[in-house]
Amino acid sequence: MLGALMGVAGGAPMGGASPMGGMPSIASSSSAETGQQTQSGNFTGGGINFGSNNNNQLLIVGAVVIGLFLVIKRK
């Protein structure tokens, strides 16, 4: 019965000896969740693309920030 429990628990098959005493070996239990991750080529930085054609947007945001700073400083 102990051999059957070890087989169900992921260890060696019935009647076989497991080096980890019924526990699955670390090498065979690795999964894609832990060590086999691939890089994603589709990652974008949340719409912030430095070096692309967003220079006008950055200039507008900068001008608004400077304008608000000057208005607050006058009061």
UniProtKB/Swiss-Prot annotation:
Polar residues bias spans = 26-39
Residues that span the membrane, as ranges: 55-72
| Membrane topology reported for the UniProt record | Single-pass membrane protein
Compartments, record wording: Virion membrane
Q: What pairs make up the disulfide bonds?
A: none
Gene Ontology terms: cellular component:
membrane; viral inner membrane; virion membrane
- Key words, A-Z: Capsid inner membrane protein, Membrane, Transmembrane, Transmembrane helix, Virion
Keyword Metal-binding listed? The answer is: no
Top-level division of the source organism's lineage = Viruses
Q: Where is this region: Disordered?
A: 19-47
User: This chain belongs to which protein, by name?
Assistant: Protein P8
Q: Which organism is it from?
A: Pseudoalteromonas phage PM2 (Bacteriophage PM2)
